[in-house]
Amino acid sequence: GWTLNSAGYLLGPHAIDNHRSFNEKHGIA
């Protein structure tokens, strides 16, 4: 989604890692 792209672009790799962890917690992956 646009949130992942925007967060990754604005905040950097740590944002992507955090987002990925969030998805794993909720089983979205």
UniProtKB/Swiss-Prot annotation:
Cross-referenced Pfam families: Galanin
GO terms, molecular function: galanin receptor binding; neuropeptide hormone activity
Chain positions found as Alanine amide: 29
InterPro entries, per database record: Galanin (IPR008174), Galanin_pre (IPR008175)
Domain of life: Eukaryota
GO CC terms in record: extracellular space; secretory granule
Coiled coil segments of this chain: none
GO biological process, any: neuropeptide signaling pathway
Keyword line: Amidation, Hormone, Neuropeptide, Secreted
Alphabetized PROSITE patterns for the sequence: GALANIN
Subcellular localization(s) per the UniProt record: Secreted
Family the entry assigns: Belongs to the galanin family.
Function as written in the Swiss-Prot or TrEMBL entry: Contracts smooth muscle of the gastrointestinal and genitourinary tract, regulates growth hormone release, modulates insulin release, and may be involved in the control of adrenal secretion.
This protein's name: Galanin
Name of the encoding gene: GAL
